[in-house]
Amino acid sequence: LKNKSLCAIAAPLIAGLALSMNVTTASAADKTAIVVGADTTFPPFETEVNGKVTGFDIDMIRAIAKAEGLTVTIKTMPFSGLIPSLQAGSIDAAVAGITIKTSRMQSVDFSDAYYKSGLSVLVKKDSKITGFGNLKGHVVATKKATSSVDYMTSHGIDPQYIKQFQDIDSAYQALETNGADAVIFDNPVNVNFKTQHPNVKTVGDLLTGEYYGIAVSKKASGLDAKMNDGLAKIKKSGEYHQLFVKYFGGDESGAVNAVEKPADVAVKD
């Protein structure tokens, strides 16, 4: 009798809990407004001009959100704060040229890849450095908590020779003022800097093949699927390709035309 009574009491409680869980998941998937984190020290993907956040990633996420019937609030922060903020649920998604990596996939979800990149070596025009192979013993600057740091430490660069900065502009400044012998960073950003500063050059081959994805909080259930759907829509409409015209002069070497799933393109680290 006691067991039957307990079952009778427990059944509606369990059903109610299950219903509550379903409602929570549904509300996350049915968001009409999202908060997107961005690091504005990553031109031409993210930058701030006259107090306005702009760039390839910003225009892209706004276009995706519009295609999905979502409104977007951009919340700026250092790159190193994006993943923790996604884990805490204080932001729903993040764009900042975030490389899809297996280690990051344990903490956050990713959309399908939207940009193919890689790391390159940037030096001053008169430098005798010809590529990554002869960087040992030289001071190399880069941005804190990025895949550039991971690559260097896993490929024989002594950490004492790695100068990490909160933003990439400070790394470039270190190079120009002889505080560093080279910069290793995402190639499109290095190329963007090089076009504006004729006293520097990129040397050697691309060091990696990396893909950027929209990072999504695991607390925002179903949002990654919406990002994928919106990305497919703006590719079909031509908006995606117009972004390459606007920010890269029509150079689509980084365009991802096929659907590239995170698990298939993630950097294994």
Locate each region found by the language model.
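Extracytoplasmic small-molecule ligand-binding "clamshell" domains
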Residues: 28-97, 237
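Periplasmic-binding protein-like
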Residues: 40, 115-123, 187, 191-232, ...
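Ligand-binding cleft/hinge of the Venus flytrap
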Residues: 48, 61-70, 148-166, 194-195
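Alpha-to-beta junction loops
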Residues: 70-71, 87-96, 138-140, 167, ...
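Short helix-initiation/N-cap motifs at beta->coil->alpha
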Residues: 74-84, 127, 163-177, 210
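A ligand-binding cleft/hinge motif common to bilobed small-molecule-binding domains
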Residues: 81, 97-106, 153, 176-177, ...
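Flexible hinge/capping segments at coil-to-helix
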Residues: 123-140
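Ligand-binding clefts/hinges and TM-proximal coupling segments of bilobed small-molecule sensing domains
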Residues: 147-165, 202-203, 232-269
